[in-house]
Amino acid sequence: MKLASWLFGIASALAGLFDLIWAEFEPAHQPIQAWSDHIPGISVLARIAAIWLIGAGLALLIRPAARTGAAALAVLYGIFCFFPLPRLISAPRYFGHHPAVYIGVLVSVAQNLILFIAALLLWLHLTDPGRISRTVTILARILFGLCCIDFAFGHFTGIPATAAMIPHWIPLGGSFWTIFTGIAFLLAGLAIITGMLDVLATRLLSLMLLLFTVIVLAPRAFAAAHNHVPWGSNAYNLTAVAAAGILSASLTISREQAPR
């Protein structure tokens, strides 16, 4: 749990740092623009959120402040979950009422929902590690698993866009890896929800996300050094790596504490 907690904090702080440098919410993972292209004081709000992410993220690295940091991140990531919601109405108007459109919007929600779940579990663990209720664990498991399943369908319905991100030097082609990782997300989601090999699934999920960061996202950031999105995507993905690790640790602890 400690390593995942530290990575969660560092990656959150990095996301905040990039938001602060560009003085904006990162459009791909903090899509506040879904509400309006002209929100008064948006740059001020972005700076406040950036400082919040930096402060809360760094607090996770300091034992006495970690509980407060986890709570602060849970609040902010919970707020981020609402950013894409207007697109459930606006996106179909532009792109039609296709399943892929709704799945894509829900992917944006799920991206922050898994971070909210991880931050909440971390806060509960830091508050009283022996008192995380079975109900909370089950609810976290189901929501996280459903998010993974949504990511899977996002891959299946957006093969061309996702495949284009895969470097050409990787064998078998982008479409193969898009489908492969989609299946991996689907199996991970089902394992997490059902509790069958759930800890293994979360660890493999964390590894897959880490490899995606190293192989795909990191080179894109250096290739577009003045673009906020690639840098923010790297920070986000590292936070997601940590989120899967936090869930894995939480499931392990819950299993160890269960009556035999």
Regions found by a protein language model. Name each.
Residues I21-I39, F156-F176:
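Membrane-interface interhelical connector segments
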Residues M1-F25, G41-G55, A59-T157, F176-L187, ...:
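Extended, low-polarity transmembrane helix blocks
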